[in-house]
C-alpha cells in the first residue's frame, strides 16, 4: 500500500483508517441549488462517442420538458462545449461559477469554458483534476436541474473513482462500439460500476452499422 494521504475520497483501499467511515463522502451542492437525478456516461475506451451520446441524452430530456445540465468531467479532453456550439467563457461571481446556458436552455460546465483558448492543453496531475470535478459539482450555481449527465473520461482511473464517491450518481450509461477490442476494455468500466454498486441503467452500442445510400 502506498503512503496514506488521508484523502479517502480519492482512495479505493479498505484500510483501517476508514473503518467505520463510509467510502462515499458526497460533496454537497451550493446553498439554493438543486439537482435531481445524476447519470454518468462512461466507457473504458476512448473514441466511442461518449460525449455525443451525453449531448443527445441531454437534448432529448430537455425536449421532453425537463431542466437538464451536463457536467463535463473529461478535464483533459473536454468536448461538450464544442458539441453544443459553445465557444464563450463561463462567468463567475466572487464565490461561485455560473454555468453556461445553451440556446435551448441546457446548463453546461466544462474546463474548456474556463480556458482563455479552447485549444489550450490541461496539464494537471490526478488530484488537481479530481478537485476540479468536485468544484464543478459543488461550486457551480446549478439552477433547478431535473437531470444531470456527467460526461466521463475514458478508463477507470482517478476521475471515475472521484465521481462515483463524491457525487450522488443514480446510475451509469455504458457506451461501446462493436469492435472486440473495445468490448474487452468496456467490460472494465462495467465491472467498476458493479464493484461500486452503481446501477447500469443503459447500454449504447454506437457506430454499430452504416446505412449505405441507394
PLM region descriptions:
Residues 1-45:
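Extreme N-terminal, non-catalytic leader segments
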Residues 32, 77, 126-134, 157, ...:
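Amphipathic alpha-helical transducer elements in NTP-driven molecular machines
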Residues 35, 46, 72, 80, ...:
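Residue-level signature of catalytic and energy-coupling elements of molecular machines
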Residues 37-75, 190:
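Walker A/P-loop phosphate-binding motif and the immediately C-terminal alpha-helix
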Residues 50-56, 77-81, 152-160, 182-185:
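Short glycine/serine/threonine-rich phosphate/pyrophosphate-binding segments
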Residues 67-69, 73-118, 123, 130:
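Phosphate-binding loop that captures ATP/GTP phosphates
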Residues 115-166:
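Phosphate-binding/switch loop-helix module in NTP-utilizing enzymes
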Residues 146-147, 153-214:
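Conserved catalytic-core segment of NTP-binding enzymes
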